[in-house]
Swiss-Prot record:
This is Fez family zinc finger protein 2. Transcription repressor. Component of the regulatory cascade that controls the development of dopaminergic (DA) and serotonergic (5HT) neurons. Its main location: nucleus. The lineage of its organism: Eukaryota, Metazoa, Chordata, Craniata, Vertebrata. GO terms for molecular function: DNA binding; zinc ion binding. Keywords: Developmental protein, Differentiation, DNA-binding, Metal-binding, Neurogenesis, Nucleus, Repeat, Repressor, Transcription, Transcription regulation, Zinc, Zinc-finger. It comes from Xenopus tropicalis.
Amino acid sequence: MAAPLETVMTPCQRFDGRNGASATPKSLAFSIERIMAKTSEPKAAAFQPSQGLDPGAKKMLNLCSPLPCMIPIQSLAYDVHSKALLNYSELWKSSLRGSVCSPSGLCKSNCGICCKNDLNMGHTVLPGSRVIKPQVINQTVGLPTNGSLYYFNYLDSSFHPPEILSGQLLSSSLINAQSQATLSAQQKLFLLENAKLSGLAPEKFPNPQYPHKERLPGQLDQVMKENSALSADRSGKIHSKLGANSAEGKPKIFTCEVCGKVFNAHYNLTRHMPVHTGARPFVCKVCGKGFRQASTLCRHKIIHTQEKPHKCNQCGKAFNRSSTLNTHIRIHAGYKPFVCEFCGKGFHQKGNYKNHKLTHSGEKQYKCTICNKAFHQIYNLTFHMHTHNDKKPFTCGTCGKGFCRNFDLKKHVRKLHDNVSSSCSLKEISRTGQS
């Protein structure tokens, strides 16, 4: 790149048509060494927009005049593609949502968008503007062979000269050509998108020379969709997730007609209805037990596998699931996080806490159709129905008494047979000691 640059940036020579001799070369405003050196950039002059600027005319600048734009000279050896060649969606979204760059020109972090952290902070910046480092674009279509480098100045402000809005070049050009260079579609889009940072719509672009929606319909349509969505998000017009389903932004409420319980989705109400209907469509093929939900049946199947990989380190008791082990550990720790607000009784499990609260409410909505006995929960009514059907699947091995629930059987053994077995064992020990 150095060799072609030297041919372009040769000292200015003025050709005198009268005598055919070249005049004495003037001193350059800046030298090649100054451009190539990695030093602090010079201060830029303030950009004064002209009132009567013709959009169709492109101002060509030669190297013998100072640059009238507010960008510093970018070192040609610097890799600007890592910072300047950004995806438009990232660049535009950062500007709309509010980037980390302050309006005063002090960049709090090297954000990679405005690159102010690498610039000299002494530059004159327009009020409400944001200086982006000049972008070097390799242009190969429709350009002369003596150079292919352009410097662009993008101003993220409310004022954009027509040259940017029409997709033409602004600031300095290193090509000594009188015909306007043709930009590629991608580079036009890059120019137009940077102009959109100020919130201009495509229909506000004054020059109809570049029908962007015909050239790049998919990209620009996506840009406008993101523009409208993010603008609405910034102004607070987008509803929350709960309010997105309704026109007024209020969450939909599905109420159970039997118990009055409220749900935020119809699916949850459908899952709740088998509680009142008593339907248990998911039946275990091993024991025949029915469940209202398929997930409960899957958890139940672990019981029949006889696998208990989760063991308690203190008592050695094993469990099918880790959640059951965690609840069991609360017993050893004496931790009862669920406390009744009426009587102050604590519970290890939340289910036992809820069942206990029903005793204080006095509501027994589940009644037996045979004896009219009422219960707090439906599973108590289910076990009560076994008394009328004479079904007692749980039998005591000592006395042969039958029970409807395994819990009642364990309670029976603990109260009656555990004391008897312990007294019998003490008598046998005393007899062996006397003999």
